[in-house]
From Swiss-Prot:
PANTHER family, per the entry: 60S RIBOSOMAL PROTEIN L23A (PTHR11620)
Family, per entry: Belongs to the universal ribosomal protein uL23 family.
Keyword Cytoplasm on entry: no
Function text: One of the early assembly proteins it binds 23S rRNA. One of the proteins that surrounds the polypeptide exit tunnel on the outside of the ribosome. Forms the main docking site for trigger factor binding to the ribosome.
Disulfide bonds: none
Classification via InterPro entries: Nucleotide-bd_a/b_plait_sf, Ribosomal_uL23-like, Ribosomal_uL23/eL15/eS24_sf
GO cellular component: ribonucleoprotein complex; ribosome
Gene3D superfamilies per UniProt: 3.30.70.330
Pfam short name (any one): Ribosomal_L23
Keyword RNA-binding attributed: yes
Protein encoded by which gene: rplW
One MF term in the entry's GO annotations: structural constituent of ribosome
GO annotation, biological process: translation
Listed name of the protein: Large ribosomal subunit protein uL23
The species this protein was found in: Oenococcus oeni (strain ATCC BAA-331 / PSU-1)
Amino acid sequence: MQARDVILRPIITESSMAGADRKVYQFEVNRKATKTDVKVAVADVFGVTVKKVNIANVRGKNKRMGRYQGLTRNRKKATVSLTADSKDIEVFKNQEENK
């Protein structure tokens, strides 16, 4: 799997932005990706050193539209911790400046 196929998008929430100060970032990743895949992809794409990767499978929520019901899609969320000497990831830094 290519590095660009592993990381789908960054997760930008209040809690993820609070973690960015401690060099902890969250990404939505491919559902077939492993911790090792995520570690290699983040290191390649952003040029940083990864300390630890935690992964959580997030189930889709039940949604209704009138009498029709369905589910949002399932996703996989990766929390990536960087080493202290790594540089910050620019995607999250730009979001902090816009607030």
